[in-house]
């Protein structure tokens, strides 16, 4: 047992002994609330205001209560006590107590102070989840530090926690990645090509194209463009994910699972949409499929399937929430960037 908790029990026993001795009246005494490390060492290793806390119940001055508590303390944990001010009790730990605790710290290692396992809750924490189309920025770094710290704290508190990175490897942004790599590859091969309007212009795209050219040469030039784009999509995704993992590992952030958005299509997405339709949470308008998010306070309903039949990013997000729940997690924590604040109401729907 931690010294602080053990000392609280000792104070409670001293109070009961004082009641049994007739020095304190019987009553509904609250448990010891505060047992803190004083700011100054001269006030001991721990200090409590329990006597002041119990003054109203005991109908006595806090100093008198403190004197009774100190009188009935029976423990080798402390070498001496001191009553200060209006009734604070300061405790000075015995050297053997300190050394014993140090031994426990060394024996337990990083798990020292961890709470017993919580068998009731399973928590999934999803964070960072930057698109695998470029480099991490300072906003991602903030989310990585915050999320990693939260995961570590929850585990220390006894929770069963899974840390997860949601890989956005489906949708238009991955198509634009492939198109951008393709344009840079063609340019490096001496051909005219332009980055698409919604493409990526960073140096990292040029580097990816250079790596492909250095490894495979010009063999992709003879391919049908559609086939070449599919290959560049996979090669680009692999390289970007490898870069993301490397940067995060250097930041001492590791994930238990990297979840692919693609794995949700088509079955899990279709199932999620069916559930929402059956519950009358969706409707068709202007050739698109909409989710009724206004009923939960959103400023407008949101498109899930566009008029051209292409799902929005929100569509797979809906299926992803259901996937987490089906995996047995009853508490979900999503750590997003500041630009995602509008998604909160949508996902709650």
Show the residue positions of the predicted features.
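NTP-dependent nucleotidyl-transfer catalytic core
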Residues: 16-19, 26-48, 53, 60-349
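Generic start-of-chain signal for non-secretory N-termini
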Residues: 1-27
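Short, surface-exposed ligand-recognition loops at beta-strand->loop->(often short) alpha-helix junctions
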Residues: 2, 57-58
């Amino acid at each position: 047992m931690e010294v602080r908790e053990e000392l609280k029990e000792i104070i409670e026993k001293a109070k009961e002994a004082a009641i049994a001795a007739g020095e304190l009246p019987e009553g509904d005494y609250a448990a010891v609330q505060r047992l803190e490390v004083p700011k100054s060492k001269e006030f001991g290793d721990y200090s409590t205001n329990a006597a002041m806390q119990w003054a109203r119940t005991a109908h006595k001055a806090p100093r008198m209560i403190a004197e009774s508590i100190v009188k009935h303390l029976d423990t080798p944990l402390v070498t001496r006590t001191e009553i200060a001010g209006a009734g604070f009790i300061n405790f000075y730990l015995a050297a053997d107590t300190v050394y014993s605790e140090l031994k426990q710290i060394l024996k337990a290692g990083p798990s020292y102070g961890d709470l017993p396992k919580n068998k009731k809750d399973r928590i999934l924490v999803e964070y960072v989840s930057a698109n695998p189309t470029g480099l991490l920025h300072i906003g991602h770094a903030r989310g990585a530090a915050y999320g990693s710290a939260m995961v570590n704290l929850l585990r220390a508190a006894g929770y069963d926690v899974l840390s997860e990175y949601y890989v956005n490897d489906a949708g238009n942004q991955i198509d634009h990645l492939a198109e951008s790599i393709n344009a840079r590859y063609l340019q490096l091969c001496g051909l005219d090509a332009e980055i698409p309007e919604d493409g990526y212009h960073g140096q990292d795209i040029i580097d990816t194209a250079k790596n492909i050219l250095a490894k495979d040469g010009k063999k992709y030039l003879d391919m049908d463009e559609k086939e070449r784009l599919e290959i560049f999509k996979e090669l680009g995704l692999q390289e970007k994910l490898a870069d993301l993992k490397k940067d995060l590992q250097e930041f001492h952030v590791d994930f238990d699972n990297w979840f692919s958005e693609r794995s949700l299509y088509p079955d899990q997405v279709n199932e999620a949409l069916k559930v929402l339709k059956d519950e009358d949470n969706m409707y068709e308008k202007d050739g698109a499929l909409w989710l009724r998010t206004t009923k939960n306070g959103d400023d407008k309903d949101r498109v899930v399937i566009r008029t051209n039949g292409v799902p929005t990013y929100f569509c797979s997000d809906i299926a992803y929430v259901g996937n987490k729940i089906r995996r047995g997690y009853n508490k979900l924590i999503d750590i997003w960037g500041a630009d995602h604040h509008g998604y909160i109401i949508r996902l709650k729907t």
